[in-house]
Design a protein with these regions (language model features):
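N-terminal nucleic-acid engagement/recognition segments and initiation subdomains in replication
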Residues: 1-137
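P-loop NTPase catalytic core of nucleic-acid-dependent motor ATPases
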Residues: 27-29, 111-185
Length: 185
């Protein structure tokens, strides 16, 4: 099948720990990682086929090709660790910006920086939206106090809420739960 041959020539097929097929697509300025059955991969495949043949792909042909590619990734591909939005990396964490350039933010105790190609594999869901690139402190002063202007959190609870908020980005810890108690209204 032409679609399967096209993917095998341009991608690497793998699977994650849950045995979901994953395609790693090297691009000139980035690397994209899509689950085979997600719309992002199908969109990429339709565009690649259009560029190669200047033809569309019938729905039944696409479904058959995706099933074959998923089987190849699950049975022949290596298991790779795939992350959604955040991942532990060396001495810090990576946060996927979900932008068109597939950039991530590497956060360490010394600060943060934008990385163009993440050392870990990030995949995306169809509903993910891009996150803004942080503004360096030299350009504008970051002020966590602005958060409290938009929330009704008592001063004595703010440190706990801030710790909860930061821990939400750490994928290697138990998932924290914030219990908000107050009168309705």
């Amino acid at each position: 099948d032409e679609l399967v041959a096209l993917v095998r020539a341009q991608c690497q097929l793998h699977h994650d720990a849950d045995r979901n097929a994953v395609a790693v697509i090297p691009m000139p300025s980035r690397r994209e990682v899509w689950r085979v059955y997600y719309s992002g991969f199908e969109d990429w495949l339709r565009a690649a086929y259009w560029r190669a043949k200047e033809m569309g792909v019938p729905e039944t042909t696409m479904k058959s090709a995706l099933a074959t590619l998923a089987a190849a990734g699950i049975n022949d591909g290596d298991e790779i660790e795939v992350h959604v939005r955040a991942a532990r990396c060396d001495d810090g964490y990576l946060i996927d910006l979900a932008d068109e350039q597939w950039q991530a933010i590497h956060v360490t105790p010394l600060g943060w920086r934008v990385v163009n190609e993440s050392p870990v594999y990030f995949t995306r869901t169809p509903s993910m939206r891009p996150r803004p690139v942080p503004v360096p402190i030299g350009v504008t002063h970051g002020d966590v106090g602005l958060l409290w202007q938009h929330t009704n959190i008592p001063a004595h609870s703010r440190l706990m809420v801030l710790a909860w908020l930061l821990d939400c980005f750490r994928p290697d810890t138990p998932f924290p739960v914030l219990e908000l108690v107050g009168e309705q209204g």
